[in-house]
Amino acid sequence: MVNRVEKLSLLSEMIAFAKYDKDIKEIEYNFLLGVAKQLDITREDFDYLIEHPVTYTHLKSHSERIVQFHRLVLLMNIEQEDNNNNSVGAIKLYNFGLRMGLSHESITKVLYLMESFPNKIVPPDVLIDIFKTQYN
């Protein structure tokens, strides 16, 4: 499991993802706050991170990086409910995935498969299988 510094880094990364091109919408804020609660980060610390991002900490565990990528996929889908500019979100997600050290083939496959699922949400088991295939 990740330590507190890594948890703050994960959350800070998600906040940066949400703020990439604009302010955080209420629905994004609530989603991120839910992730913060899952990570045992207080609301005060979460609100502080919005204005004061922490330095990116690379996750050592491949499985933790996949989980974080899945969170970003979900966040991207929330962002795009009101926005039809799918290419900006896809590019943003692709770049964040590369920065996490995930394979570009897997990221591309996830982005491609998103179109075939309801609400563009790739089920966790499908996502894991995609990355597992590339990892082996």
State what each model feature region is.
Residues 1-18, 23-136:
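Small-residue-enriched hydrophobic alpha-helices in membranes
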